[in-house]
């Protein structure tokens, strides 16, 4: 179970060794709290209440992950679904570009509104940025 890619020469590896394989359940259990913690910490450091964020454009891994991360950040399960645009329903998992794709399709903030763009992926890497429309 590798959670990262290995640099490898094709002539020295079998086809099974060249494949990228993750245990979906463990990724879900590990990544959701990690991403929620990063976003929450970032908002706290910038004195932003999570409930004051107008949109969360998250990596489009799957709907369950997106909803769980948002519910952990917002500390509630009953939030407006428009807070977390999910083009994954129409376009599937777009890998690293998923959060930016969601942002591009749903960039409807008003001046002064804040949002969070967050991507995560292979190797349990996570990055996040807070944006504010001016």
Locate predicted features:
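Short alpha-helical patches at coil-to-helix transitions and adjacent helical residues
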Residues: 32, 63, 93-100
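Broad hydrophobic/π-residue packing in well-ordered secondary structure
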Residues: 55-56, 91, 126, 133
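Short Gly/Pro-enriched loop/turn and capping motifs at secondary-structure junctions
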Residues: 62-64, 91, 108, 124
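Hydrophobic alpha-helical segments
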Residues: 72, 76, 91, 105-110
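Cysteine-centered functional microenvironments
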Residues: 84-98, 118
